[in-house]
UniProtKB/Swiss-Prot annotation:
Pfam families on file: Carboxyl_trans
Bound cofactor: record note: Binds 1 zinc ion per subunit.
Name of protein: Acetyl-coenzyme A carboxylase carboxyl transferase subunit beta, chloroplastic
Domain of life assignment: Eukaryota
Function as written in the Swiss-Prot or TrEMBL entry: Component of the acetyl coenzyme A carboxylase (ACC) complex. Biotin carboxylase (BC) catalyzes the carboxylation of biotin on its carrier protein (BCCP) and then the CO(2) group is transferred by the transcarboxylase to acetyl-CoA to form malonyl-CoA.
Family affiliation: Belongs to the AccD/PCCB family.
HAMAP family xref list: AcetylCoA_CT_beta (MF_01395)
This protein's encoding gene: accD
Catalysed reaction equations from the record: N(6)-carboxybiotinyl-L-lysyl-[protein] + acetyl-CoA = N(6)-biotinyl-L-lysyl-[protein] + malonyl-CoA
GO MF annotation terms: acetyl-CoA carboxylase activity; ATP binding; carboxyl- or carbamoyltransferase activity; zinc ion binding
Entry binding sites for Zn(2+): C271, C274, C290, C293
Keywords assigned by UniProt, alphabetized: ATP-binding, Chloroplast, Fatty acid biosynthesis, Fatty acid metabolism, Lipid biosynthesis, Lipid metabolism, Metal-binding, Nucleotide-binding, Plastid, Transferase, Zinc, Zinc-finger
Amino acid sequence: MEKCGFNSMLSNEELEHKCELSKSMDSLGLIGNTGAGGGPTLIFDVRDILSLIYDDTFKLKDRNGDSYSVYFDIDNKIFEIDDDSDSLSGLDIENQNQIFFDIYNDSDSLSELDSENKNFEIHNESDFMSKLESSFFSYLTYSCLKRRSSFSSYPTSLTSSNLNSGSKSYNPYYDPYMHDTRYSWNNDININSCIDSYIRCEIDSISSGSDNCSDSYIYSYICSEGVSYSDNGSSSIRTRTSTSSGSSYHIRGRSNNFEKNKKLKKLWVQCENCYALNYNKLFRSKMNVCEQCGYHLKMSSSDRIELSIDPGTWHPMDEDMVSTDPIEFHSEEEPYRDRIDSYQRQAGLTDAVQTGIGQLEGIPIAIGVMDFQFMGGSMGSVVGEKITRLIEYAIDRSLPVVIVCASGGARMQEGGLSLMQMAKISSASYNYQSNKKLFYVSILTSPTTGGVTASFGMLGDIIIAEPNAYVAFAGKRVIEETLNKKIPDGLQVAEYSFHKGLFDSIVPRNPLKGVPSELFQLHGFFSSTFHPLKSNKVKR
């Protein structure tokens, strides 16, 4: 029986682990016999071994500098080698301090060898996966302990009984995530995330010239508790990295959710457009704009107020106004009142809009900012009442009004009452604009849809939209199902609507504060000392 081994070139005196991959290789054309058992041995770099987990093709180089491609498909159980040269037959190996991944042919786990294309299929992957799991787990465990040794000493003996017991008492550096990796090997999400994170850690250590990545957020992400994943959504990241020796390799990671880990979310924000990572601590100072592609991500109402209003001039109105389930809406999943309470705790708001008085570059204004994080910014009776009171207050004080829209439309849990808010706000706006001749600026952010678009969102004297904002009355899916027609992509983005005359201007966030200020000055509003009236707080 001939053997084909995966040589990781890992020179570790303390770690020796063997797991053999055996297959009759009589017809494997270009690959010569270099191993001790007469079978060919393929040389892999450590990082390339980690990449075996991904269903992707990656480039490898042997010690002679010759390169070839390897494809490993877990789902279809295919391992394929595509050499760029005829140099695979001359590979030589060192027999000590190396890790092998071998799987015996006892259970016919490997069959249907294709000599022409140099690939074989795995029919029974149970042995293959279990032994690959064991080797990979041992490598990661050893690496974590080795990197921590630069800070403090640790017991060098790490027996299988210690690992299987799951006890933390025997070793203060016990890594529960690494332990759990063995038992969640069939979970593709955990596998991809763990490997992707570890590779990123290795990249950081290479680029910094250091041999430890304990300071890296990725390292703490791998070797820590409390890791959770979700199956919603997907994304892909491809990175090309060059090492100090000049060799390069490709890493392709998969993220199955923008919020797949709480720790990662606290440190990084992933762009919805290009999937680039933005450092969270600097993200607010960048106004939630992606540094890589310039995409405008969603902002909370509090961040909007901080961006738009001069510091120390914000005076909120009607903060205690809350909904009391006016139509007693009942849902099989979750009662409406419970949902309201849940969103109030999550967003820190009483409802989907904040209204108040402030100054914009010294000019007193009345401003309302909707928050999409609160039930999708849906417009219920509280939202309608707060905006109506804001406009009426602006009429009494002759203030310009700015409303920042971010809404999914009317709130279905309040039925006809939510629809009546459209008429109520529009009536107040008519009195403000037509009778009092005051100035109203509407700012549309992504998304602005439904009843908000059909009412006060489009009633501004000046209508400003953010770049790439999703502005529509009905969503794309609703239109397609209603009309039974395919809607072209990009039909409901701000740029398309702007060319059709729906908006007056598209303004990025950086100069957004200055544009309304110039408009107010043009219409006769100037800086002045302003003392806001004490607002009436109504609880319903």
